[in-house]
């Protein structure tokens, strides 16, 4: 019997070999990540008049009521902005009775403001696959900021397999951090500053820029087509504008605009844990943070020659009204689960983990951002296609990069 927890890479491979996860033509081994499986879109996209959940019916039965047409994805097809599509995935499931699954967009998908969620037969919730599920998987896709082109076989989201109840409570998280530090300061911190824990680990936004003239990106309202299969092909300025705080040090988020920002803290996920960016807390502001939620074991474990941890890039959208952000404001939360076993290969270990050393990295489709240069003496650093490792700059870390932050639970917040 599988130990309780998130299933690691070797256990996912076993699910595939036993036929619990299957696809015509097999499943590429490269799609199996340390704690998740990349799912591939199929050959047809159905254009919908609205989103839906099947409830007491199969997806294909209810699809007939909402379908407005079909697109052939075998040669590539264009998906329009703000139009929902439903795409059958190549992978199907026949899960053992003790295993359930949960889906999230891939990092590269979320950074393009492409909203995705998995739908199952008889499903009452998006992105949740019940224990012992047998059947097809479908992906709802809604491009928000850009018109995109996709082709069958492309991967837009991931599936994480879980047994038992592996969620770490606050005490467990504090203890895990004591054994192997999880969060580190990404910039100068005040003496005694702590990272806060309350049903997960809070992360705050970095509006310092750490030596650059801007602190993030805002998606442009562009009619240009973005082919997701192309790499390092598009100019940043055609799709993004750089944003910076106002004279008071605040960044004003405009309603329904999409922003890429970065966490002030650096995060390192131990090999025995998996993390997920939790849904936004509406009491913290009308914000949606982080479409792409999975952080695999080994994320931020950049090696002995670098400062530990990696910044989390935050995908943020304000709703209804403008919203003011300040440097260091808590913006999102990481929740943690135990692994059923450590993965045989960790994130960043030859698996094409593009964002392991990121500061503020755009998707792989974009060229290096030559408008985002950081100059230190005669040394010129770029970020974009090759994310910067600014943690190594002495004036960015103030010599404190190696010291983990102390964690404090909500009990000590006086709330």
Task: Please state what every model-predicted region is.
Residues 1-415:
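DUTPase catalytic domain/fold
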